[in-house]
C-alpha cells in the first residue's frame, strides 16, 4: 500500500475529478466489495470515516451527490441514517469505484493497520505500519495459508475478507493463490455478518 497521505491526496483528487480506476477482471472492485459486504460492516466503515476522517467523508458525500444529480446540501440535511443508506447504495455503482476505494483504503490503513501489519509480517514482507513499497510477484501457498489463518484467528472473518480482496485488487498484487483462497475458503465470504 502507498503511504496514507498519498492515498488521501490521490483518492480525494480522483473523486473530485471523477477519475475511474483501472479495472481488473479477476477480483472484486471496491464498489462490489461495498455491495457484497454485510450492511453492518459497511455502516461501520462509513461511521468510522464520518467520525475520524471528515475530509474523506465529505469528498465521498460530494461524489455521491454528483452521481445522484443533487446538491450536496440536500444530502447533508438528511438524517444521518438516511444519508448513510443513500451513500452506501450509491457507492455500489461502477462509476463510483474510486470513491468506494478511497473509503475502504482510509478505513483499512487508519483503523485496521494492526491487521495489515500482522498479514505482511506473517508473509515476511517488509512494511511500515502496514504500508509496503514493493510487493513480491508471488507468495508460496503454505506461507499464504498460514498468514490468512492467523488473521482469521485474530480478526472478524468478514473484515479479513474485505482486506484481502482489497489487498489483491488495489495493490495490483493479483496473487492467483490468494484469489483462489478468497473464492474457496468459506470463512472469507462477504456478507456473512448480516
Regions found by a protein language model. Give the residues of each.
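Hydrophobic membrane-targeting and insertion signals
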Residues: 2-20, 27-36, 181-182
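Generic low-complexity segments that are intrinsically disordered, proline-rich and/or Lys/Arg-biased
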Residues: 3-5, 32, 40, 56, ...
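A short amphipathic alpha-helical interaction element
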Residues: 10-11, 42, 116
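Compositionally biased, intrinsically disordered low-complexity segments
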Residues: 13, 18, 22, 48, ...
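Acidic, low-complexity, intrinsically disordered interaction modules
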Residues: 47-171
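Alpha-helical oligomerization segments
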Residues: 161-192
